[in-house]
Amino acid sequence: MYAVFQSGGKQHRVTEGQTIRLEKLDVETGAAVEFDSVLLVADGEKIEIGVPFVNGGKITAEVVSHGRGEKIKVVKFRRRKHSRKQMGHRQWFTEVKITGISA
């Protein structure tokens, strides 16, 4: 059984027991989280597609940790002007473990 849900402006395909990284959620470590914006639920041959969300669809997860991703370097370079600027960015994330999928 797998499901597709929406969180942080992105869509994620998950199965029960899977650990994934989402955009940062304001929830403490060890807390339970529920996602109601389920787009698709598939169980073997039975596939339920939402318009836009599945009625009664719910994904429960447990927050494992919070952290920051790897650094991305951004370079702004102006040719022939002897000018350059280098910046870095590390995006915050929340790691969750999927504990249940229901439709």
Curated annotation (Swiss-Prot):
<keyword id="KW-0687">Ribonucleoprotein</keyword>
<comment type="subunit">
    <text>Part of the 50S ribosomal subunit. Contacts protein L20.</text>
</comment>
<dbReference type="GO" id="GO:0003735">
    <property type="term" value="F:structural constituent of ribosome"/>
</dbReference>
<dbReference type="GO" id="GO:0005840">
    <property type="term" value="C:ribosome"/>
</dbReference>
<dbReference type="GO" id="GO:1990904">
    <property type="term" value="C:ribonucleoprotein complex"/>
</dbReference>
<keyword id="KW-0694">RNA-binding</keyword>
<dbReference type="GO" id="GO:0005737">
    <property type="term" value="C:cytoplasm"/>
</dbReference>
<dbReference type="GO" id="GO:0019843">
    <property type="term" value="F:rRNA binding"/>
</dbReference>
<keyword id="KW-0699">rRNA-binding</keyword>
<comment type="similarity">
    <text>Belongs to the bacterial ribosomal protein bL21 family.</text>
</comment>
<keyword id="KW-0689">Ribosomal protein</keyword>
<dbReference type="Pfam" id="PF00829">
    <property type="entry name" value="Ribosomal_L21p"/>
</dbReference>
<protein>
    <recommendedName>
        <fullName>Large ribosomal subunit protein bL21</fullName>
    </recommendedName>
</protein>
<dbReference type="InterPro" id="IPR001787">
    <property type="entry name" value="Ribosomal_bL21"/>
</dbReference>
<dbReference type="InterPro" id="IPR036164">
    <property type="entry name" value="bL21-like_sf"/>
</dbReference>
<comment type="function">
    <text>This protein binds to 23S rRNA in the presence of protein L20.</text>
</comment>
<dbReference type="GO" id="GO:0006412">
    <property type="term" value="P:translation"/>
</dbReference>
<dbReference type="InterPro" id="IPR028909">
    <property type="entry name" value="bL21-like"/>
</dbReference>
<dbReference type="InterPro" id="IPR018258">
    <property type="entry name" value="Ribosomal_bL21_CS"/>
</dbReference>
